[in-house]
């Protein structure tokens, strides 16, 4: 349900962009994002930090897009948000010496430090890749191509990254599970 709520503004943006235009789509995106935040607060009583970053960026750049009738602002949003996430992951690991991914998921998953570090770097690389490909597509292709990429390309890339993360973690989680079973059998 939560993931569906996160996709609704994007889907509405895409449909309105294809049928009406940039200004209308940007305004629908902003309105849907505000409604999404209200729904998240009512249903889950909490809005995550990454959702706040995305939501504030959507409202800010969406309103600029609507006001100036220029999709460039939403294109910049994708680049800027991906840059923020990549920098946050890298700073957490190299400045604060604790991967952000570990801070977010460390209570749910017990993994060796090197696995957390590789996972953190993998996601930083993913956000950098998305940032670069967004710049290329937004600068060298039409707005329609960019809108398709934003909705389908980035969503597909994100899905691939999540699946890749699962495949990377699977052997480590399996080892952990076996250790726990062995510890349980010796008691």
Swiss-Prot record:
The lineage of its organism: Bacteria, Pseudomonadati, Pseudomonadota, Gammaproteobacteria, Pasteurellales. It is a multi-pass membrane protein. Plays a role in cell envelope biogenesis, maintenance of cell envelope integrity and membrane homeostasis. The keyword Cell membrane applies. Pfam families: IspA. The chain crosses the membrane at residues 24-44, 53-73, 76-96, 121-141, 151-171. This is Inner membrane-spanning protein YciB. InterPro entries: YciB. GO terms for cellular component: plasma membrane. PANTHER family: INNER MEMBRANE-SPANNING PROTEIN YCIB, INTRACELLULAR SEPTATION PROTEIN A-RELATED. The keyword Transmembrane applies. It comes from Glaesserella parasuis serovar 5 (strain SH0165). It is found in: Cell inner membrane. Belongs to the YciB family. Keywords: Cell inner membrane, Cell membrane, Membrane, Transmembrane, Transmembrane helix.
């Amino acid at each position: 349900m939560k993931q569906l709520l996160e996709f609704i503004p994007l889907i509405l943006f895409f449909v309105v962009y294809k049928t009406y235009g940039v200004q209308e789509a940007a305004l629908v995106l902003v309105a849907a994002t505000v409604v999404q935040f209200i729904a998240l607060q009512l249903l889950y009583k909490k809005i995550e930090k990454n959702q706040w970053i995305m939501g504030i960026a959507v409202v800010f750049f969406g309103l600029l897009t609507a006001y100036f009738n220029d999709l460039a602002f939403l294109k910049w949003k994708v680049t800027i948000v991906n840059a923020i996430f990549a920098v946050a992951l890298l700073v957490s690991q190299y400045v604060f010496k604790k991967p952000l991914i570990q801070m977010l998921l460390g209570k749910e998953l017990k993994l060796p430090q090197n696995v957390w570090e590789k996972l953190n770097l993998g996601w930083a690389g993913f956000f950098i890749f998305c940032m670069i490909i967004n710049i290329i597509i937004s600068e060298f292709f039409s707005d329609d191509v960019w809108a398709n990429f934003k909705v389908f390309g980035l969503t597909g890339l994100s899905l691939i990254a999540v699946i890749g993360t699962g495949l990377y973690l699977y052997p480590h989680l399996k080892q952990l599970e076996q250790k726990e079973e062995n510890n349980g059998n010796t008691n």
